[in-house]
Amino acid sequence: MATEPPSPLRVEAPGPPEMRTSPAIESTPEGTPQPAGGRLRFLNGCVPLSHQVAGHMYGKDKVGILQHPDGTVLKQLQPPPRGPRELEFYNMVYAADCFDGVLLELRKYLPKYYGIWSPPTAPNDLYLKLEDVTHKFNKPCIMDVKIGQKSYDPFASSEKIQQQVSKYPLMEEIGFLVLGMRVYHVHSDSYETENQHYGRSLTKETIKDGVSRFFHNGYCLRKDAVAASIQKIEKILQWFENQKQLNFYASSLLFVYEGSSQPTTTKLNDRTLAEKFLSKGQLSDTEVLEYNNNFHVLSSTANGKIESSVGKSLSKMYARHRKIYTKKHHSQTSLKVENLEQDNGWKSMSQEHLNGNVLSQLEKVFYHLPTGCQEIAEVEVRMIDFAHVFPSNTIDEGYVYGLKHLISVLRSILDN
């Protein structure tokens, strides 16, 4: 039987000096929580992490996650053996004297680690000081997905195994579990949230729609964010397929993409553009506009050719619902736009036949397009939660299985 690895507490701060925080130089203790700007303040100006979607919540659990005034996040160390094990993992990967190529590569897929932090009033309360992956986003859409066929580690008791299996019996077959999500809806300027009960309700038949919900902003499916997420996951998969040092249990992927946008022109100009191009083509009520950086706005012209340029931000944005995706170089997704001469669905029509509801919807969609769109969406996918990571001499088949199935689900969302 395998023996559990030791978990020494190596207190060090491998991050850059400006991000290292020593308890001795923290500001004056604030004592009990006090309201500040509508948010409760804890521990030297720290506040509960507002955009947390899963895991231990500060104020609800004995341990939780806080936001430090410098923009980092503080994850309170869990009780032994989980907390010391996670601390050991971060110290091992981010050790200054680490020359292991596998671990150096792994750093790319983790939040940056800046050592440990503790408040002067409670020096024994240890927190992992980590990068806030959502920090650069204005309206971050966030999803936490537990990866692997088993959510319990090799040293779990029979009671623990039974408990974990009963929470989500499909874990072994599906290979991942949505623990929570927070999606920004542009039309209402608000967030839709789902917790772990939502993820546990998903079956083999509904998992695709359940995941795609994270990429829908209330107007359209963010296929650009889906495609970017696939690319990120594939890099993590490649790392797992080439390492036999570590096995991960009950670990997650954190997905983040930008949900907000800024208008490239005024509403009036966007409406004018919509009227101009829609007046030359037909868009039925059943057809769906989908949000993708590689799409084009199609319109009928005198010679039947395509592309209507609507500015740099719009010209590569939209197409009809009927699209063809092909896989290139491990799911590099490209779009084949049909020539209108071969597409009888687009028929010339006069302005009076324009559906007012469609035009109104287009105005809103155009207005909420992101500016300065790149070829691929700004997306972060990072590995988190390492309280159950163990040394190994074999490929982590359970994690690999989960990644592959998640990629398959995301591809099916693109191809549908």
Swiss-Prot record:
Effect ascribed to mutating K146A: Loss of kinase activity and ability to execute necroptosis
Region (Disordered): 1-38
Result when mutating R82A: Strongly decreased enzyme activity
Modified residues (Phosphoserine): S7
Description of activity control: Inhibited by flavonoids that occupy the ATP-binding pocket. Inhibited by myricetin, quercetin, luteolin, kaempferol, isorhamnetin and diosmetin, and to a lesser degree by rhamnetin and apigenin.
Modified residues (N-acetylalanine): A2
Effect of Q78A: Strongly decreased enzyme activity
Enzyme class at the top of the EC tree: transferase
Outcome when changing Q196R: Decreased activity with inositol 1,4,5-trisphosphate. Increased phosphorylation of inositol 1,3,4,5-tetrakisphosphate
Catalysed reactions, as listed in the record: 1D-myo-inositol 1,4,5-trisphosphate + 2 ATP = 1D-myo-inositol 1,3,4,5,6-pentakisphosphate + 2 ADP + 2 H(+); 1D-myo-inositol 1,3,4,6-tetrakisphosphate + ATP = 1D-myo-inositol 1,3,4,5,6-pentakisphosphate + ADP + H(+); 1-octadecanoyl-2-(5Z,8Z,11Z,14Z)-eicosatetraenoyl-sn-glycero-3-phospho-1D-myo-inositol 4,5-bisphosphate + ATP = 1-octadecanoyl-2-(5Z,8Z,11Z,14Z-eicosatetraenoyl)-sn-glycero-3-phospho-(1D-myo-inositol 3,4,5-triphosphate) + ADP + H(+); a 1,2-diacyl-sn-glycero-3-phospho-(1D-myo-inositol-4,5-bisphosphate) + ATP = a 1,2-diacyl-sn-glycero-3-phospho-(1D-myo-inositol-3,4,5-trisphosphate) + ADP + H(+)
Residues given in the record as substrate binding sites: R82, K146, K160, I161, Q162, Q163, Q164, V165, S166, K167, Q196, H388
Pathway: Phospholipid metabolism; phosphatidylinositol metabolism
EC number of this enzyme: 2.7.1.140, 2.7.1.151, 2.7.1.153
Record's subcellular location: Nucleus
Similarity comment: family membership: Belongs to the inositol phosphokinase (IPK) family.
Protein name: Inositol polyphosphate multikinase
Organism this protein belongs to: Homo sapiens
Gene: IPMK
